[in-house]
Amino acid sequence: MQLYDELKARGLIAQVTNEEEISEMINNGKATFYIGFDPTADSLHVGHFMALCLMKRMQMAGNKPIALIGGGTAMIGDPSGRTDMRSMMTVETIQHNCDCFKKQMERFIEFGEGKAQMVNNADWLMNLNYIEFIRDIGSCFSVNNMLRAECFKQRMEKGLSFLEFNYMPMQSYDFYYLFKHYGCNMQFGGNDQWSNMLGGTELIRRKLGKDAHAMTITLLLNSEGKKMGKTASGAVWLDPNKTSPYDFYQYWRNVDDADVLKCIRMLTFLPLEEIEAMDSWEGAQLNRAKEILAYELTALVHGKEEAEKAQTAAKEIFVSGGAAANMPTTTLTDADFTDGQIGVLTLLVKCGLASSNGEARKLVQGGGVSLNGEKVADFKQQLAKDFFNEECMIKKGKKTFHKVVLG
């Protein structure tokens, strides 16, 4: 099976500008393509997973990836899919985030001469002359067409700033610049970027008289139509310091039965024939499918050694009801205690088991938190420092365990 057909079979392709030409290019390793990454955090997360896996598949087939970090456009903020305006970021923060991204991307694609490249659009956008830009580039855009774009519709009622209105021409200029200077003939992105991507292909056609192509990637949604990659404590990050390999493994191990085979098909590199054989699995077999999914994705992001540790810890915890050497652990210091005590809500947030005191309070009130096997009944409960002289085991829900020790 050729690459384009495999991408379709895995459910990865949403929209394309010209299916025949795109399939010809990527099947024969003739695509130099780019995917943009908005450096609004210091780590990639599960929401980026589809794009990273696609870049890896494309490079394996001989195509050349360009990872474009939006260091310039991040100074504006993409209005796509938002109902409010993004906060401004400093140049230093953006550069730090860019450096973090590249380190994580190296798990998926190979950078180097004649291989993948990473570029930062700040290198060309920050030096643009505004008068020349609106004359040479702005003249190629119809305001009427831009206002009909989906990415702007959602913002019109609450107010769309002129700053954000410039985002589409600037992203389109990225494609135009990469086409001219890097031979980039294709852009991939999420469904919410379709209008911006078409702006780029049209700009290239009008300015250079040449064809460029765009393809959107299917969004990773669960069976309820919600984006995957969120937990009670926030996003599922690829940085092990923000989401431990164990917690990353557990996220995929606990996906809904209705989502597991879709995730295996879209995200893993297992052969399609092997995945199709799982279509008839049910009951305990679906639990096995979840273990396969969790192991494969953890190995992809964190390496096989960490995946094996996480898998072993998960099995030990299930059998023993809580004791495992590789369990996520939080170490408390004197600074964490006030007058020799720490509140249970503060503890849950400190351990990453809740994103806020409000979230922690709901967990306790719902009967979802236990300490050393005893259910926590009072969200105002204070724990003395000597409570942690022996190991403290927190259980959240039925499947999440966390160990707390004194430093």
What are these regions (language model features)?
Residues 1-193, 198-201, 208-213, 226, ...:
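NTP-dependent nucleotidyl-transfer catalytic core
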Residues 204-407:
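Conserved nucleotide- and phosphate/pyrophosphate-binding catalytic cores
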